[in-house]
């Protein structure tokens, strides 16, 4: 159970958060868009005409950013266990990514033409206990990595949220075994006290 004091502090921080205000003013659905935008501006990994797969897309902020960049010549495929309000130009599949049926459907959708970018902002429902939350998060990261390896073009990019803790170093090693380029980003919109960081990988190693 969340203590009233903690809940009140979170609400106060949320209301006064500069990125929340910017998102509301710009019509974005979440403050997390500024994490993505910062890294895109730095690394230029989404471009006009790209095909993008957005995993854990709800409420749709990252898909909003992606479709603006790829334009009508590109494509954004979004998926989440939660529904999202339609976004013009974005194809949405609702379902649990950990279920074989949803995973295989996404593979079928993307196999006809490989994707240029796989995004994953997936996170489990948090219990507040790191011993439970981090393993669940790592499982989602590993599933997203597997999807990226199977669906990306050789020079495609994989951008994934990862929580630092048990299994983090091992996941980075997994990424390095599959991609020639792996870097860690901590965007300004990611709160300093948060253990989340983002991995950006590219140059898929051919087996």
From Swiss-Prot:
Coiled-coil region list: none
Keyword ATP-binding: no
Native organism: Ruthia magnifica subsp. Calyptogena magnifica
Protein name according to UniProt: Ribosomal RNA large subunit methyltransferase E
GO cellular component, one term: cytoplasm
Active site residues according to the UniProt entry: 161 (proton acceptor)
Top enzyme category: transferase
Catalytic activity, reaction form: uridine(2552) in 23S rRNA + S-adenosyl-L-methionine = 2'-O-methyluridine(2552) in 23S rRNA + S-adenosyl-L-homocysteine + H(+)
CDD domains: AdoMet_MTases
Subcellular location: Cytoplasm
Primary role: Specifically methylates the uridine in position 2552 of 23S rRNA at the 2'-O position of the ribose in the fully assembled 50S ribosomal subunit.
Pfam families listed in its UniProt record: FtsJ
Binding residues annotated for S-adenosyl-L-methionine, in chain numbering: 60, 62, 80, 96, 121
Keywords, alphabetical: Cytoplasm, Methyltransferase, rRNA processing, S-adenosyl-L-methionine, Transferase
GO MF annotations in UniProt: rRNA (uridine-2'-O-)-methyltransferase activity
């Amino acid at each position: 159970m969340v203590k009233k004091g903690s809940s009140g502090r979170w609400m106060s921080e949320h209301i006064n958060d500069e990125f929340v205000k910017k998102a509301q003013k710009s019509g974005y659905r979440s403050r997390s868009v500024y994490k993505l935008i910062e890294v895109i501006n730095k690394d230029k990994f989404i471009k006009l005409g790209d095909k993008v797969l957005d995993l854990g897309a709800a409420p749709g902020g990252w898909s909003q950013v992606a479709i603006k960049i790829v334009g009508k010549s590109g494509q954004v495929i979004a998926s989440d266990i939660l529904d999202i309000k339609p976004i013009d130009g974005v194809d949405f599949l609702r379902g649990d990514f950990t279920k074989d049926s949803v995973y295989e459907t996404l593979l079928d959708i993307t196999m006809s033409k490989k994707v240029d970018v796989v995004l994953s902002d997936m996170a489990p429902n948090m219990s507040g206990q790191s011993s439970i939350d981090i393993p669940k998060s790592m499982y989602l990261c590993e599933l997203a990595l597997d999807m990226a390896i199977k669906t990306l073009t050789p020079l495609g990019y994989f951008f994934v949220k990862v929580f630092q803790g048990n299994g983090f170093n091992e996941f980075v090693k997994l990424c390095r075994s599959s991609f020639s380029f792996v870097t860690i980003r901590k965007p300004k919109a990611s709160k300093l006290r948060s253990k989340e960081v983002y991995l950006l990988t590219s140059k898929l190693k051919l087996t």
